[in-house]
């Protein structure tokens, strides 16, 4: 079938329903079909079970293409294809549908220009100079606003509109919630869990209790209808999704989509398989569908038309919806060449688009490990900006995610110093790290820091707060808070790209009705998954600590260097004799930082430890209570005593006293206006600023969400595919 791909290079052969005011051209790739017809169902979205009003025979073209052109303004007309294969007629929703009806069972012709909100053509992305300037906040549409204390208007709760509504506070207070909280916190980017049309929510029964993360895709090029104000009208979800992106951009926040191209929610009766049986999915040695996703199937990205489908879809979202980045679910199931092509095509649109993903699979796959986009193969991207999640730093901070009671550096484990150091240098090559002692590997896997996503928690597994409590059931809340603060301090002072789970900043917890912690809440009720905004008040100290760390990172380039060479030259670990103690210095003079020398110390022991710093006289800006860019204390001499379970960041007194803000970073200093998310800095090493295509650092961060996702995803996704 690969020969069919050649014809599709022709611009004329644009798959899907191609609308114009006076006609619409329908094009489907179905090379094994003996007959294809176009079924038209009228323009009533509420009449979603009616029989076809008109059925038209399509013409067979070259190389598997079927097409028909129908005159008239068909905007809003629902349609499907009737595909005959081996004498059986399959009703197929267009794999390239740009709009659908309720539950995604019928495609809809759409005039996309009519879905643009006012001012869409002038939508401006918040500036991003370097990928490492990103601060990513992972959230779920429903979780973010469904809580009774979110302050969001009732009809907007759990919807696209609830994400961007401004002026919201916890009722009866001035404590900010929603998008205003994000602006106050200082994040640059929201990563939104799957928002293209998925199977698990019945959009005709939204008055019943339903919940799902959405990792069971049905229609790749259409927003999910359950988050819209009207899932029956195909145009509404599109317009409201665009409004969400536009308003987030106005708030200085970029948008990353969590995309699930590695599998589909259905297999035998998926749109793809009904159109071209067995082509879109890999098979195992027994001839059945392979299951590297843990969800019943896995797409074959190495096949030309599957690769085309994925690349076309990503490009479509980037262009039509102004998306700023893509996080690839189970990226390890995609082949390296597909990921490279995605990066190349996105660079043609906007080099600042991030790409990152999970550098693992959810089970065994027939795709060769040499060709797979797994974490270990990140080096094969050269200097492309395709990033993977660092399970190294995640598990080094808090313990293995698949062993709930296993601790690590911050919560009582021993022997994780080198793993933390490996995370600090963004999993890049560094002679100061003893790779034989790194928990999850023995060598560097990233060529550049912008290829690494650092995090302590994500939607999978226990929340950070719940993990810390589980590993230390007898610890006081004050002790757990210190562990949480150190976890955050490690993430936000490490090189690479920082990432956090929504609510982590105020001790997010997921508690089941029986009082146990939920480690796989993919379909748990709102009571488990919602962002509990009252915790922002209860844990205001922790929230302010995160806010201060973000301010520190955004204000000082030393914490977000652009290249491995910069890290090797300007980050020096301090030799310490004590266990559970990591210390290092940063030379800011070579990376455009107003602070000449910075020292960072993590003392995970239950007692104070003394560290001798190079040079004398230091100013403390981060301690066990506060974080930021303001003076907390002054240290005379070179010896500093770090309290138990405490992180310290110190600055040499002379450069601190100069009172200058990081060169080129003035606009980064957090403020109440939307400019607090403008990222500026040293551009000298930003591939997007050079003409050298070989060193391009594609900013479509393929967030390889690291973590041994095999277990998590097998569990999560088997549950999704019944």
Walk through the language-model features, giving the residues of each.
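Glycan-recognition and catalytic regions of carbohydrate-active enzymes
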Residues: 436, 496, 500-513, 534-598
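Short proline/glycine-enriched turn/loop motifs at strand-loop junctions of beta-rich domains
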Residues: 30-35, 605-606, 615-616
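The feature marks proteins involved in alpha-glucan
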Residues: 1-23, 50-52, 61-158, 162
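C-terminal low-complexity, Ser/Thr- and acidic/Pro-rich disordered "stalk" regions positioned immediately N-terminal
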Residues: 657-690
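A cross-kingdom C-terminal cell-surface attachment/processing module
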Residues: 695-717
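Substrate-binding/active-site clefts of carbohydrate-active enzymes
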Residues: 142-321, 331-350, 354, 365
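C-terminal beta-strand-rich structural cap/linker in extracellular carbohydrate-active enzymes
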Residues: 30, 75-76, 633-662
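Conserved alpha/beta catalytic core and glycan-binding cleft of carbohydrate-active enzymes
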Residues: 110, 343-344, 352-507, 513, ...
């Amino acid at each position: 079938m690969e020969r069919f791909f050649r014809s599709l290079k022709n611009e004329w052969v644009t798959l899907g329903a191609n609308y114009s005011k006076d006609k619409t051209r329908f094009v489907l790739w179905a090379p094994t079909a003996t007959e294809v017809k176009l079924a038209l169902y009228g323009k009533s979205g509420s009449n979603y079970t009616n029989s076809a009003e008109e059925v038209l025979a399509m013409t067979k073209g070259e190389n598997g293409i079927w097409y028909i052109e129908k005159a008239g303004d068909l905007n809003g007309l629902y349609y499907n294809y009737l595909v005959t294969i081996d004498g059986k007629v399959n009703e197929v929703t267009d794999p390239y549908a740009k709009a659908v009806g309720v539950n995604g069972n019928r495609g809809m012709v759409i005039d996309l220009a009519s879905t643009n909100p006012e001012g869409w053509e002038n939508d401006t992305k918040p500036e991003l100079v370097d990928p490492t300037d990103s601060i990513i906040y992972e959230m779920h549409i429903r979780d973010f606003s469904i809580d009774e204390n979110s302050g969001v208007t009732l009809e907007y709760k759990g919807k696209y509109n609830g994400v961007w509504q401004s002026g919201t506070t916890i009722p009866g207070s001035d404590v900010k919630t929603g998008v205003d909280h994000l602006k106050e916190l200082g994040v640059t980017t929201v990563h939104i869990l799957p928002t293209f049309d998925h199977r698990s929510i019945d959009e005709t029964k939204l008055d019943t209790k339903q919940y799902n993360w959405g990792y069971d895709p049905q229609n790749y090029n259409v927003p999910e209808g359950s988050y819209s104000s009207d899932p029956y009208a195909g145009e509404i979800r599109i317009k409201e999704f665009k409004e969400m992106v536009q308003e987030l951009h106005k708030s200085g926040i970029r948008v990353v989509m969590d995309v699930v191209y590695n599998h589909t929610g259905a297999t035998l009766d998926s749109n793809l398989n009904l159109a071209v049986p067995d082509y879109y999915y890999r098979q195992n040695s027994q001839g059945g569908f392979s299951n590297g996703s843990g969800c019943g199937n896995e797409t074959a990205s190495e096949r030309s038309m599957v690769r085309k489908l994925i690349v076309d879809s990503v490009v479509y979202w980037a262009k039509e919806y102004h998306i700023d980045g893509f996080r690839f679910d189970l990226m390890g199931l995609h082949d390296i060449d597909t990921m490279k092509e995605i990066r190349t095509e996105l660079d043609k649109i906007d080099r600042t688009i991030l790409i990152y993903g999970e550098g693992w699979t959810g089970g065994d796959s027939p795709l060769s490990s040499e060709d797979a986009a797994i974490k270990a193969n990140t080096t094969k991207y050269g200097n492309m900006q395709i990033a993977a999640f660092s399970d190294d730093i995640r598990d080094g901070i808090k313990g293995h995610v698949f062993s709930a009671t296993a601790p690590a550096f911050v919560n009582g484990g021993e022997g994780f110093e080198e793993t933390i150091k490996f995370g600090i240098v963004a999993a890049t090559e560094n002679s100061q790290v003893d790779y034989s002692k790194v928990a999850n590997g023995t060598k560097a896997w990233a060529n550049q820091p912008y290829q690494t996503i650092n995090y302590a928690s994500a939607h999978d597994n226990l929340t950070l707060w719940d993990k810390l409590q589980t590993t230390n059931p007898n610890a006081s809340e004050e002790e757990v808070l210190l562990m949480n603060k150190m976890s955050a301090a490690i993430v936000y002072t490490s090189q690479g790209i920082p990432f956090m789970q929504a609510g982590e900043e105020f001790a997010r917890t997921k508690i089941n009705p029986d009082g146990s912690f939920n480690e796989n809440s993919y379909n748990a009720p709102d009571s488990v998954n919602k962002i509990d905004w009252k915790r922002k008040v209860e844990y205001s100290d922790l929230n302010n600590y995160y806010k201060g760390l973000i301010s520190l990172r955004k204000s000082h380039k030393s914490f977000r260097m652009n290249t491995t060479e910069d890290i090797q030259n300007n980050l020096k670990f301090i030799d310490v004799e004590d266990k559970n103690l990591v210390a290092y210095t940063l030379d800011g003079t070579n990376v455009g930082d107003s602070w000449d020398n910075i020292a960072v110390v993590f003392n995970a022991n239950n007692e104070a430890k003394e560290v001798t710093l190079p040079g004398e006289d230091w100013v403390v800006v981060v301690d066990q209570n506060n974080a930021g860019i303001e003076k907390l204390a002054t240290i005379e001499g070179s010896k500093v005593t770090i309290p138990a379970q405490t992180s310290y960041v110190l600055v040499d007194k002379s450069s601190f006293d100069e009172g200058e803000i990081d060169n080129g970073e003035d606009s980064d200093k957090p403020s109440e206006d939307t400019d607090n998310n403008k990222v500026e800095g040293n551009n000298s090493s930003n591939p997007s600023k050079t003409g050298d295509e070989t060193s391009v650092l594609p900013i479509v961060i393929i967030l390889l969400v690291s973590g041994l996702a095999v277990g998590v995803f097998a569990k999560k996704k088997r549950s999704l595919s019944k």
